[in-house]
Amino acid sequence: QRQNSKISLVEYDMMKQPSMANQYNVDPSGTVVFESGDTKKNVSFYQMFFPDQMGSYYFTGEEKFTQAILNVTSTEKHTVYFLTGHGEIPMTELSTLRSNLEGANYVVNELHLYREGKVPDDAEALFILGPQNDLNNAETELIKQYLNGNGKLFLALGFNQNMATAWPNLDSIMAMLGVKDEHAVAIEPKQTTLFDPLTIVPQYGFHTIVNKLDETSLLTVMSLAISLNVQSDATDYEPTLLLKTTNQAYGETNLEMLLNSRTQKDDNDISGPLNLAYAGENKDR
């Protein structure tokens, strides 16, 4: 047993003390149990490693341990909602994001806005991830009211071949935040052995959201990224650029050609660099 003023560390041999294994519901491969009062959080051996995009595994134990300590020592919870009902990415495909949020003491819920009739009062943030269909007028108004009441929104556009006409309400929410949807898919002509022209590794802007990623040389990888720009007539929100392409990229506006696996820059397309993500912040807050 080892300890300091904050933490006591006790190691048990589960073969010699099987009752402890049953009491703490440990995994046979090995488990670290964090306990504070009546609150417990288990981190198994398998949870300490995470696969990267190249198929290798890297150690995430420090992150998992930090989350576990936070889970058992903090009584403060933050509630966030993921919008459903418009073909958004299902929660079953967002297990890593959900796990990380819950590890940071967030309570994650799904929200069918048309059914509920409002964004819940305890919503500290609303996520809209990859919707295939537009919101209706009533839902749009509810979200705008939520934003006007200091709500926070994370919106990631999906791909729709009719995006120029199919998303007027989503476009209006972005316009309120000072961002314009240019209805074009980012193309990076310079191919590599790792990525095709539709796969973008963007450059970072200057904002607290992305500064740490830039400082630690962590890459963001995007596919079917949508070109955005500043909405010049927005008055309440100030957009700050987070992600952009190289100068060689362009925005393909002929989505029918793109669906047929063909693309060629012409006068109707948008010249790079393209802006791919913004943080819209209220000027008065």
Description of each model-found segment:
Residues 1-133, 137-140, 144, 158:
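Juxtamembrane extramembrane loops of integral membrane proteins
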